[in-house]
């Protein structure tokens, strides 16, 4: 168990078996408690175990946590703690510890291993058990500790503290046997535990003295037992308090949940009330038939509100669920801790039993007097066991309470699940995807929607029923109207009213027709509205089917996953199905009632109109069809009468025709006699005599009855007339014929039957096609009835013809009544048969309707199922599309992040790669990185890295591709990064090789140093012995005469010599290292040049083949006799071009080889014609198209790279030579003035007698000067002589400079040493070894060069070295006097350095320039001291040894930066410029005795040179820049007319407007120019100031930086070489701090963009 965090750490004293883990933080959830039984994160939950350690030593020490009995003051902790919240046990323990400091207890024991018990009430068990066992431990461990001397950590290691009694002063323990009582706490009122233990050890020794010791010890043990009981009670109270607090918090949470549940039920009741209200509204709307838009909108708003409320409830439920999960985690954690405490208890029990057994063994050997003590101990242990038993009982009670709480927790979980299943599990914080996929949320939504749709469907079904009832009522009214119309418009009425005239009848018919039309229109409108309602109902049923299918599928899906949720949903589904079944039953019941009402209505119609239309059915009887119009019936009756007349005329004899006429006349008379009854007839028609029966007795003499009877008779008489005609015809046939005639009469009955039945057929047609088969099926049953009726009519109507011939009289009324009765009987029989037929028809119709209803219900159910499936599928598609959209959004975000990370990684990788290359290049060139302490590979640390990035070829390609096409950029990026990876691998391999070489060199150096040190030690020992012998020989007096001054001088001189030796040795090491670097670079360049030679050979061969092919084609194509001369000229020219190109390739290869390796080779040119041929075949001069075209691919155009590469790769990698820039240059070349075109002169002045020393390798080693030909192409001049004053920082130049000058210096010092003459150090320019080459006679020198070199060496050996020259360095100054049209003088001299004051206004410090290389910075610190010593007089030949001076000179001259060592010079009167220019007609070696004042001079007469010399001086002062052209090339540019004389003449430079920048100046990216502009000291002067000041700045007009260094004023840090004169180009650049580095010159773009080491560092601001 972890100790409380609040207890002070002073308590640790005993040995600690294992480090205890960090105690859990003491914190309490402000809103809720984790669990009532197992609180989370309480540091001191099982308090008893935290205070004892497992070992026997620490058991005593750590049990002292119980020993200190608290004061009452210290006991009263934080009175507001109970009100503030849960009082954490660990905090309480800490407060107690502060109130009463405990004894020096041991450290907290480690957490014991977990036991496997799960009871949460073991805490009190542990506490009480420990309290009992502690008392036992006190007695048992006393002997062990007294025998073993006690634990060392407890007794001997404790500082002295006051004893509990505090009377005597504290004292340290005297011996290990006497334990320290000072470990007890000061504030304790009783003896603490550790003190009592120690005291028991003391009293054990004194047991033999008497029983008083036993009594005292017994009292101590009892007091300890009482204290431990109090402690256990306190712990028990704390535990109860903690449990109550947690129980209270859980009760509060339960109340809160119940309140939330009540709130939710309240909202549900409100929603139910609103739902009922909406149902009532919808019912009202269904009854009125109006669709209320406001109501629908209100319902939608209510649905939205309910949805929001349900979402909020879901969110709250989710919060509750999270809390429950957190509680589960806390419970689990507390279970684990309980297991750990159980294990700790077991371990402590074993640890307690060990000392008990040990003490029992010891006490067995003791005296019998100790047996009483053992009994006391056993009694105490029995007491402790009782207490332990009580604690176990309490723990059992706690276990029961815990199980009860667990059950409550489970029940709460079940309630939560029910709540969630009822109200869904929707959380607004969920994403849309989870929202779509959450089963609970969809289920609840669908339930709500399903209820709404079901309610709406119920309302609509009710509305449909109401509409059907209303529709049937309207149809009944319409049928009545049609009946009235049919009664008026039938043939019987026409027959009845034909005698009255048709005026009134026509008007009433028209009115009835209009009314019928109006009723039909209204019926059509009703049909449309019912169709619309049916469509709406179908749509709603579709929606309901969709939701039902969705709901059923959800239930089916959720049955597998969550069966708890699917049960209530299944119950709801079953309830919904039952409700639907009840509704369908109600609908069927209503339909049945509707049918019953229809049948009653039909019967009523039949009864009312029986007398009117016996053979016809009313439209109401015909069913619900509104299309049944009875108008065609009258027309069929009329046609039937016509047909009957025609048949009678054709068939009956004239007698029979007369009888028929008589009968018809009689009927007409009867109708005519009924004139008085018309008003009654109308009244009958208006009153709709529905209750009249024909078979009633006609004796009633009442008016209405008579009128009805007469009306019925008159209506039926017309029908009877036709039937009597046919009957008399058949009766005459029967009476007047034999059996054969009877058969004929019977055969003529079928037409009669058909005639009678034609009405039935017409009726069947009117009834509709649905009931045709049963109508025709009953036809055979009718025939015998009709025959019987006719037979009876035949018998009774025999006397009719005799009576009908008589006129009507009043006395014949009785006979009429008897006839009418007979007719009524006949009609009654017909009506009975008609009723039977109607009953059969109604039964058939009802059966058909039931079948149709069943079929419709099945169809509706199928449609509902289909709509459900469709809705389900639509929901699934929507959820899938939503999920897909979310996934697409997520993946697009991931993709964007990945793209950004990959771009950042590529960017960083590219920067790292460039940094590695930069570092590798500088290492190869021998430059040391600045030791700034930072990691040089750190990407963001150096600002120059972005400059490197802009130079890098990949960035250039990026910009080109972005400018040209974006598609190519996206396609080429993977290839570029693959290429970058490959380059990175190569660079790392090279770095590994270099590191390996460096390691090997380091080991060799260490070996050399070890050997040298050993030899030096031996020499030193020998010299010491020698000096001691010499001192003994010379004796003491000589030593005294020497004095201390001599020794001090010797000491100083020795120190200086040691210092100089170390510096010279470091310089020698640097030179050897650079020599190795240059040799390695040369070997790489050799391979590169061999590859280039092969490539150029292949190109030349290919061009030769192309030219031969062209020539052969031209020869074949052209006419030989017309174009012979031009052909010959073309052939001659092409062959001349190929020849010159071959010569040029050979020369170029040799030049590059010699230039790359730095071999000092000079070539004699015998004549000007030979030199001209060399110039002709040069690819860098104008005159060859092929040369101009091949230029961008020519590797010689770029800088000499230290890494091998083919020309194609160079053109791809170097941004200086991209195709876009070449096009740009070609476009800008059109703006060149025509004066820039080079004119070729084939007349070289061979008679001048000038000896030309041609040295091509310098052109490639020291930065190729660039001019432009007439086409704007960049060309590089090959003709350089030795004096090229441009301090290139390329690796080859540095290596060659150091190595060649080092060799020359060694030879020169050796010669001086042999000569023995000590001269002042006058040497050639230290930065100029490339111009000097070797002063040895190399084998490949020409005779002239050997002669000149010999002269120089003689001069150096001569007495010129005797001169005391205070200037320690000299310079080569190349000077060209430029005339406008005359021949010019070119003078090159190696002269001593003029005084600094003559060129600059003030002297400048050696460290003023920051534009030096990094390597020279490191060397400068050591060599500054050397120079300061050299300036002292002791370094002159009078005071110092020549060896010292030689070493200092070699150290000085080996530095790379010439400007460093042009330090504070002595005041020297006279100018080197004056010496070199006053005697212009001097011979070649006139000033050779002045100390290399002129290496050689090429002199010619000129008329205007003085002003040019002055101009050259001023330009040199103002802007010292390296030469643009070589000496030979300058000479032939000016003499032979090759140069653009107007633009490059220096005489006109000051007055004319300066030329625009060369096209190559636009080649670099603008970003590089801006960065260079920022880094170049942010100079104040603009381009115009620079251009105007160049020819005119004098001594004081030179711009200087803070240290006095001359700073070139510029805008873009780019010099325009085309505007410089030759004199300024030949000036010494090292006089200026800003040298003409390739980064300043736009004419060397490839060097400035790639040479990271060649870029000058920014000047110090």
Swiss-Prot record:
Keyword terms, alphabetized: Cell cycle, Cell division, Coiled coil, Cytoplasm, Cytoskeleton, Golgi apparatus, Membrane, Mitosis, Phosphoprotein, Secreted
Gene Ontology cellular component list: extracellular exosome; extracellular space; Golgi membrane; microtubule; midbody
Annotated region described as Disordered, given as residue ranges: 1-187, 353-373, 1196-1221, 1432-1456, 1538-1563, 1636-1661
Coiled-coil intervals, chain numbering: 218-281, 310-351, 450-484, 820-865, 1083-1117
Localization in the cell: Cytoplasm, Cytoskeleton; Golgi apparatus membrane; Midbody
Keyword Transport assigned: no
GO biological process, any: chromosome segregation
Induction or repression: Up-regulated in the plasma by adiponectin in healthy fasting female.
Residues making up the signal peptide according to the UniProt record: none
Listed Basic and acidic residues bias regions: 1206-1215, 1652-1661
Site (Cleavage): 926-927
UniProt KW Chaperone keyword: no
Chief site of localization: cytoplasm
Low complexity composition-biased segments: 76-94, 133-149
Function according to Swiss-Prot or TrEMBL: Microtubule-associated factor that enables integration of the centrosomal and Golgi-associated microtubules on the Golgi membrane, supporting directional migration. Preferentially acts on the perinuclear microtubules accumulated around the Golgi. Associates with the Golgi membrane through the N-terminal coiled-coil region and directly binds microtubules through the C-terminal domain. Required for faithful chromosome segregation during mitosis. Regulates autophagy by playing a role in the reduction of glucose production in an adiponectin- and insulin-dependent manner.
Family: Belongs to the MTCL family.
Entry protein name: Microtubule cross-linking factor 2
Native species: Homo sapiens
Organism phylogeny: Eukaryota, Metazoa, Chordata, Craniata, Vertebrata
Gene (UniProt): MTCL2
């Amino acid at each position: 168990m972890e100790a409380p965090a609040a207890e002070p750490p002073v308590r640790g004293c005993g040995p600690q078996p294992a480090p205890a883990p960090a105690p859990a933080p003491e914190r309490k959830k402000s809103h809720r408690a984790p669990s009532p039984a197992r609180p989370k994160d309480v540091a001191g939950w099982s308090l008893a175990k935290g205070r004892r350690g497992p070992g026997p030593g620490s058991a005593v020490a750590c049990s002292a946590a119980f020993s200190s009995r608290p004061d009452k003051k210290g006991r009263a902790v934080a009175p507001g703690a109970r009100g503030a919240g849960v009082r954490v046990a660990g905090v309480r323990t800490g407060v107690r510890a502060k109130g009463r400091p405990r004894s020096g207890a041991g450290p907290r024991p480690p957490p014991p291993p977990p036991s496997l018990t799960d009871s949460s009430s073991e805490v009190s068990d542990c506490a009480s058990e420990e309290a009992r066992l502690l008392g036992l431990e006190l007695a048992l461990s006393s002997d062990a500790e007294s025998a073993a001397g006690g634990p060392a950590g407890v007794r001997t290691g404790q500082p002295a503290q006051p004893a509990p009694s505090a009377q005597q002063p504290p004292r340290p323990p005297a011996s290990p046997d006497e334990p320290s009582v000072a470990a007890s706490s000061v504030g304790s009122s009783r003896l603490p535990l550790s003190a009592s233990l120690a005291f028991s050890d003391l009293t054990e020794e004194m047991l033999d003295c008497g029983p008083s010791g036993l009594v005292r010890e017994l009292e101590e043990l009892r007091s300890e037992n009482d204290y431990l009981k109090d402690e256990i009670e306190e712990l028990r109270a704390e535990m109860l308090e903690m449990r109550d607090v947690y129980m209270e918090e859980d009760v509060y949470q339960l109340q809160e949940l119940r309140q939330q549940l009540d709130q939710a039920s309240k909202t549900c009741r409100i929603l139910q009330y609103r739902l009922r209200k909406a149902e009532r509204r919808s019912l009202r709307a269904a009854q009125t038939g109006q669709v209320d838009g406001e109501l629908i909108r209100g319902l939608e708003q209510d649905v939205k509100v309910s949805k929001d409320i349900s979402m909020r409830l879901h969110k709250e439920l989710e919060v509750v669920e999270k809390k429950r999960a957190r509680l589960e985690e806390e419970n689990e954690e507390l279970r684990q801790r309980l297991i750990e405490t159980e294990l700790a208890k077991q371990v402590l029990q074993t640890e307690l039993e060990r000392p008990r057994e040990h003490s029992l063994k010891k006490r067995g050997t003791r005296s019998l007097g100790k047996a009483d003590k053992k009994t006391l101990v056993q009694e105490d242990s029995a007491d402790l066991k009782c207490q332990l038993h009580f604690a176990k009982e309490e723990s059992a009670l706690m276990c029961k309470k815990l199980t009860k709480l667990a059950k409550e927790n489970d029940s709460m979980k079940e309630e939560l699940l029910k709540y969630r299943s009822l109200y869904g599990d929707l959380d607004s914080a969920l994403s849309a995807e989870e929202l779509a996929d959450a089963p609970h949320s969809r289920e609840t939504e669908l339930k709500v929607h399903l209820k709404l749709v079901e309610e709406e469907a119920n309302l609509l079904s009710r509305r449909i029923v109401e509409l059907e009832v209303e529709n049937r009522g309207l149809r009944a009214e319409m049928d009545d109207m049609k009946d009235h119309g049919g009664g008026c418009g039938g043939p019987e009425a026409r027959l009845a009213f034909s005698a009255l005239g048709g005026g009134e009848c026509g008007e009433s018919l028209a009115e009835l027709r209009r009314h019928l039309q109006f009723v039909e229109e209204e019926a059509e409108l009703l049909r449309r509205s019912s169709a619309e309602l049916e469509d709406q109902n179908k749509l709603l049923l579709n929606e309901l089917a969709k939701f039902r299918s969705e709901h059923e599928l959800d239930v089916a899906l959720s049955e597998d996953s969550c069966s708890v949720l699917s049960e209530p949903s299944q119950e709801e589904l079953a309830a919904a199905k039952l409700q639907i079944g009840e509704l369908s039953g109600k609908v069927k019941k209503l339909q049945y009632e509707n049918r019953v009402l229809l049948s009653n209505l039909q019967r009523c119609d039949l009864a009312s109109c029986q007398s009117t239309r016996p053979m016809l059915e009313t439209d109401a009887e015909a069913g619900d069809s509104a299309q049944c119009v009875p108008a065609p019936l009258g027309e069929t009756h009329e046609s039937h009468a016509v047909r009957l007349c025609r048949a009678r005329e054709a068939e009956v004899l004239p007698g029979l025709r007369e009888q028929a006429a008589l009968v018809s006349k009689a009927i007409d008379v009867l109708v005519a006699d009924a004139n008085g009854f018309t008003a009654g007839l109308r009244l009958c028609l208006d009153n709709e005599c529905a209750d009249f029966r024909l078979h009633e007795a006609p004796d009633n003499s009442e008016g209405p009855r008579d009128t009805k009877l007469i009306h019925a008779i008159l209506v039926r008489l017309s029908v009877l007339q036709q039937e009597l005609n046919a009957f008399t015809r058949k009766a005459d046939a029967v009476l007047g014929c034999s059996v054969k005639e009877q058969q004929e009469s019977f055969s003529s009955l079928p037409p009669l039957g058909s005639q009678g039945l034609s009405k039935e057929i017409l009726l069947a047609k009117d009834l509709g096609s649905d009931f045709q088969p049963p109508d025709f099926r009953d036809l055979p049953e009718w025939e015998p009835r009709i025959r019987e009726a006719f037979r009876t009519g035949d018998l009774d109507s025999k006397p009719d013809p005799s009576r009908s011939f008589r006129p009507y009289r009043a006395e014949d009324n009785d006979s009429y009544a008897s006839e009418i009765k007979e007719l009524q009987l006949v009609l009654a029989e017909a009506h009975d048969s008609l009723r039977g037929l109607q009953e059969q028809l109604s039964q058939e119709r009802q059966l058909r309707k039931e079948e149709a209803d069943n079929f419709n219900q099945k169809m509706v159910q199928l449609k509902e199922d289909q709509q459900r499936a469709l809705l389900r599928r639509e929901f699934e598609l929507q959820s899938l599309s939503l999920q897909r959209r979310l996934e697409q959004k997520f993946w697009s975000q991931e993709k964007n992040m990945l793209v950004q990370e990959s771009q950042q990684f590529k960017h960083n990788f590219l920067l790292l790669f460039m940094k590695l290359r930069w570092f590798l290049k500088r290492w190869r060139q021998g430059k040391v990185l600045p030791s700034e302490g930072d990691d040089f590979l750190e990407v963001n640390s150096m600002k120059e890295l972005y400059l490197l990035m802009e130079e890098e070829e990949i960035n250039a390609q990026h910009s080109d591709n972005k400018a040209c096409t974006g598609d190519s950029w996206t396609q080429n990026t993977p290839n570029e990064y693959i290429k970058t990876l490959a380059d990175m691998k190569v660079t790392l391999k090279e770095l590994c090789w270099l590191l390996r070489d460096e390691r090997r060199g380091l080991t060799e150096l260490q070996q050399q140093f070890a050997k040298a040190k050993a030899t030096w030690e031996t020499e030193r020992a020998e010299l010491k012995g020698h000096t001691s012998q010499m001192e003994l020989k010379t004796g003491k007096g000589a030593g005294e005469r020497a004095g201390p001054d001599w020794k001090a001088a010797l000491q100083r001189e020795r120190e200086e010599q040691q210092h100089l030796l170390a510096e010279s040795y470091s310089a020698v090491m640097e030179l050897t290292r650079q020599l190795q670097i240059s040799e390695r670079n040369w070997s790489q360049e050799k391979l590169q040049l061999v590859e280039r030679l092969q490539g150029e050979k292949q190109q030349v061969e290919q061009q030769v083949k192309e030219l031969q092919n062209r020539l052969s084609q031209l020869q074949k194509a052209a006419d030989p006799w017309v174009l012979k001369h031009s052909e010959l000229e073309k052939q001659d020219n092409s062959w001349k071009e190929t020849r010159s190109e071959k010569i040029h390739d050979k020369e170029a290869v040799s030049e590059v080889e010699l230039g790359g390796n730095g071999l000092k080779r000079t070539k004699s040119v015998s004549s000007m014609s030979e030199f001209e041929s060399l110039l002709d075949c040069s690819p860098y001069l104008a005159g060859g198209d092929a040369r101009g075209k091949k230029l961008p691919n020519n590797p010689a155009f770029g800088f000499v790279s230290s890494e091998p590469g083919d020309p194609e790769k160079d053109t791809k990698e170097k941004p200086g030579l991209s195709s876009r820039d070449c096009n740009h240059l070609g476009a800008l070349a059109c703006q060149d003035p025509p004066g820039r075109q080079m004119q070729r002169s084939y007349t070289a002045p061979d008679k001048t007698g000038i000896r030309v020393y041609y040295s091509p390798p310098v052109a490639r080693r020291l930065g190729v000067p660039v001019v432009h030909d007439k086409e704007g192409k960049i060309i590089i001049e090959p003709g350089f002589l030795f004096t090229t004053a441009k301090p290139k920082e390329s690796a080859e130049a540095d290596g060659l400079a150091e190595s060649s000058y080092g060799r020359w210096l060694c030879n020169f010092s050796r010669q001086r040493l042999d000569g023995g003459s000590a001269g002042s150090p006058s040497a050639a320019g230290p930065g100029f070894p490339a111009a000097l080459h070797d002063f040895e006679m190399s084998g490949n020198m020409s005779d002239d060069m050997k002669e000149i070199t010999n002269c120089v060496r003689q001069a150096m050996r001569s007495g010129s070295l005797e001169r005391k020259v205070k200037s320690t360095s000299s310079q080569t100054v190349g000077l060209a006097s430029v005339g406008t049209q005359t021949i010019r003088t070119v003078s090159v001299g190696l002269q001593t350095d003029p005084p600094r004051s003559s060129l600059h206004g003030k002297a400048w410090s050696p460290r003023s320039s920051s534009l030096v290389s990094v390597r020279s910075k490191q060397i400068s610190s050591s060599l500054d001291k050397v120079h300061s010593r050299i300036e002292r007089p002791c370094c002159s030949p009078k005071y110092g040894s020549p060896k010292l001076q030689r070493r200092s000179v070699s150290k000085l001259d080996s530095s790379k930066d010439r400007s460093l060592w042009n330090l504070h010079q002595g005041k020297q009167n006279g100018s080197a410029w004056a010496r070199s220019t006053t005697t212009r007609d001097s011979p070649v070696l006139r000033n050779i005795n002045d100390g290399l004042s002129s290496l050689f001079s090429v002199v010619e007469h000129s008329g205007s040179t003085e002003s040019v010399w002055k101009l050259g001086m001023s330009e040199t002062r103002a802007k010292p820049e390296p030469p643009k052209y070589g000496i030979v090339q300058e000479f032939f540019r000016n003499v032979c007319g090759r140069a653009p004389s107007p633009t490059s003449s220096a005489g006109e430079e000051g007055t004319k407007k300066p030329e625009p920048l060369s096209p190559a100046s636009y080649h670099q990216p603008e970003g590089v120019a801006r960065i260079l502009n920022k880094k170049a000291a942010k100079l104040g002067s603009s381009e115009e100031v620079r251009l105007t000041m160049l020819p005119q700045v004098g001594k004081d007009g030179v711009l200087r930086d803070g240290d006095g260094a001359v700073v070139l004023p510029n805008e873009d840090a780019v010099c325009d070489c085309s505007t410089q004169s030759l004199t300024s180009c030949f000036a010494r650049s090292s006089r200026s701090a800003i040298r003409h580095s390739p980064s300043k010159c736009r004419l060397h773009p490839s060097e400035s963009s790639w040479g990271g080491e060649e870029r000058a560092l920014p000047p110090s601001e």
